[in-house]
């Protein structure tokens, strides 16, 4: 009889607890599903190193699937998604115990206590944590895009170093040929070679050899940077170094670039997620007006008949000034986050204009070199060859003219490098830098 007399009260407590359950929201379910799906992509089969002569997209894909900073950002996002469920859950029940002891045990009263926070308050807290998980996802997206941008910049730098080294080696051959011809002219006295010209060429040769040594160091540094951008440690196998010449990337018009920036920029999306989180925190602050309560029961198993002692408590949110201040502070944080979104949009417009200026400046230089300077040097080379064949000029003029053309090609390569670095920043700004099959949600 005694156990049955306490059963109705215990059953009532369990029914009350089950009725206070807050189910996961649609946003929480979507976040959990998407984090699981992307986790399977990131932690799936080992990603092989790109094959020799692989396109840039293969290197980008390898980096965004393997780089530790991407995996760390994903784990942070996953942790924030998993933290939503504990936020909306009830506190753990408490097993209590009370006894009265004199010479003997007078009362023996175990009990069970449940703390209750209203479903509305826990829903608001869950919504705030869901907004925090959205911010964590935006941080993850920014990390993926930044990783891809680092790979592309390292790729541009490596391609520049390789091509510049080849051009400098061609300069060395042209100078060596000029020096040889000038030395023959000076020694035989049959040409127009002079000692000062021979010395000048020797100095130029030494300068080019020094430039080649610098470029070789630059190439080694670029390869190390490229390997690091891929997420490979120093003691891991080197990747197949890309052997693709730099080419100018075609960009959409300025209006389209701004539309993509406004819609997809990672930094702007982070600011907007922070604003959503600040809005959710206002609802949490408002729910502080709602009291919390606790109910439970204790049963004295020494008493006959069995004595059951119900207990209950309730919080009294009477300090209205404190509640109002917390709400006002949350609203101020929301206003600040909204203002930061506007400030970021203004900054992005200025950055877009600056990046486009750098691209156009490089385009102007490349156009001048390709359409004016290099054709002019080709005519100079043809004239020098014709003069030598007719006996009217020195053969040393031919390699010297070729050297000037090579130097101009190096100038073009430098302009193209600066252009592609600016293009990389533009692609990062518009969130177009990662390959199409990156570990990102379609909504990104």
Region spans (language model):
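Periplasmic alpha-helical coiled-coil/stalk elements that build and connect Gram-negative outer-membrane
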Residues: 21, 25, 122, 138, ...
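Membrane-embedded beta-strand positions of outer-membrane beta-barrel proteins
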Residues: 95-99, 112, 271, 293-297
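Amphipathic alpha-helical coiled-coil segments
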Residues: 60, 72-87, 143, 149-170, ...
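A glycine-/polar-enriched beta->alpha junction
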Residues: 61-72, 78-93, 106, 110-128, ...
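Solvent-exposed loop/turn segments connecting transmembrane beta-strands
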Residues: 98-109, 274, 299-309
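Acidic, low-complexity, intrinsically disordered peripheral segments
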Residues: 2-4, 21-28, 411-444
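Bacterial N-terminal signal peptides
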Residues: 10-18
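Bacterial Sec-pathway N-terminal export signals of envelope proteins
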Residues: 20-92, 141, 192-195, 234-276, ...
């Amino acid at each position: 009889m005694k156990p049955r007399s306490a059963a109705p009260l215990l059953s009532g407590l369990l029914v009350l607890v089950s009725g206070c359950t807050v189910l996961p929201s649609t946003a929480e379910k979507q976040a959990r599903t998407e984090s699981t799906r992307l986790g399977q992509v990131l932690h799936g089969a080992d990603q092989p190193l790109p094959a020799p002569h692989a396109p840039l997209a293969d290197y980008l894909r390898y980096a965004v699937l393997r780089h530790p900073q991407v995996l760390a950002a994903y784990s942070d996002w996953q942790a924030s998604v998993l933290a939503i469920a504990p936020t909306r859950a009830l506190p753990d029940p408490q097993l209590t115990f009370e006894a009265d002891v004199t010479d003997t045990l007078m009362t023996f009263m175990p009990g069970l206590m449940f703390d209750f926070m209203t479903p509305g308050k826990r829903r608001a807290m869950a919504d705030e944590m869901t907004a925090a998980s959205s911010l964590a996802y935006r941080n993850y997206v920014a990390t993926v895009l930044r990783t891809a941008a680092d790979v592309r910049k390292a790729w541009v730098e490596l391609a520049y170093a390789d091509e510049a080294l080849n051009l400098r080696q061609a300069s060395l051959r042209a100078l060596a040929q000029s020096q040889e011809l000038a030395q023959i002219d000076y020694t035989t006295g049959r040409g127009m070679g002079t000692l000062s010209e021979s010395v000048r060429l020797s100095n130029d040769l030494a300068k080019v050899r020094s430039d080649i040594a610098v470029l070789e160091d630059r190439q080694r540094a670029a390869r190390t940077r490229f390997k690091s951008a891929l997420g490979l440690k120093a003691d891991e196998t080197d990747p197949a170094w890309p052997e693709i010449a730099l080419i100018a990337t075609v960009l959409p018009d300025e209006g389209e670039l701004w539309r993509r920036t406004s819609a997809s920029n990672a930094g702007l999306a982070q600011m907007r997620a922070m604003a959503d989180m600040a809005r959710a925190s206002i609802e949490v602050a408002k729910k502080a007006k709602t009291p919390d309560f606790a109910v439970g029961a204790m049963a004295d198993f020494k008493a006959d008949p069995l004595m059951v002692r119900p207990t209950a408590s309730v919080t009294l949110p009477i300090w209205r000034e404190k509640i109002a201040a917390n709400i006002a502070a949350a609203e101020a944080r929301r206003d600040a986050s909204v203002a930061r979104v506007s400030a970021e949009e203004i900054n992005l417009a200025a950055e877009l204009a600056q990046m486009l200026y750098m691209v156009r400046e490089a385009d102007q230089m490349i156009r001048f070199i390709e359409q004016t300077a290099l054709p002019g040097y080709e005519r100079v080379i043809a004239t020098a060859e014709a003069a030598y064949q007719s006996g009217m000029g020195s053969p040393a003029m031919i390699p010297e003219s070729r050297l000037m053309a090579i130097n101009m090609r190096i100038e073009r390569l430098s302009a193209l490098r600066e252009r592609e670095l600016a293009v990389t920043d533009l692609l990062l700004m518009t969130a177009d830098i990662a390959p199409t099959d990156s570990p990102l949600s379609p909504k990104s």
